[in-house]
Amino acid sequence: VPYLEISNIGGGGAKIQAVEGRPMGDIYVQVPQMNENGEYLVSDKGLYMNQTELQRVGNINPDGVGGLFSSFSYKNIFLDFSIDFRIGGDVINEMYQYSTASGLTPESLQFRDTEHGGLSYYYPGNNNASGVPVQVDPSLGAGPNGETVYHDGVILPGVVASTGEKNTRIIPAGYYYNQTYNWGTQPEQLTYRHSVFDNSYVKLRELTIGYQFPEKLISKLGMTRLSVSVFGRNLFYFYKALKNYDAESSVGTSWASQAVVGGSTTATRNFGVSLRASF
């Protein structure tokens, strides 16, 4: 058996595998084809064409994890804190994948209009269904026959697979995102390669500030120790490579499911008050 499939994400669009001769937990996804010159191959639809086999793009295992706990006190005031960290290890961000397909992420603003790099074009005869878009100057108010001019065009860098010529096919930004991101392995250009991210972080796990009452005061109450404190948990990240998502918002608790972001509840901060007494 050359490999074992540990996890299947998005109907086979991404997989976590244990491959003979490789560290366990490699991430495999569909990636675009290239020619011998390193240029992407573009279909007649204006979209990239994926290779037939999934390719390795990362590994879910971190290079290191750890934590730090420390406590300080001054007279009767004390402060405790704990910090957790993770170095390396990739995650597959399903939430990012599907949100980008729907135009809900900041990254999907690219090409949406002229301000964000979109090209201007029209469909001859306003034939949006089967017409080939024609690029025009952004200042043009309408096509030669009064056609609607759109400003959300994108031309993907590469060469047309069927001709070997430079790609000049304009496609709408929404079409590009929906056909490139999304769920599954179809259409042929869909890929999870943009949704694999480093998950390194340094996090303030817990912070406690409290006051310990003097022994001579509490001894009259029959106590040997009395303290009151306020605490907070999951307060913030000092550093987080995974932007806009909580680094611990995985779909499960197993070592493989922790490498998939999506479908979890919203991360929360917890605050509280603690009163501890010893008799």
Where do the model's predicted regions map?
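Outer/extracellular conduits and scaffolds centered on Gram-negative outer-membrane beta-barrels
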Residues: V1-F279
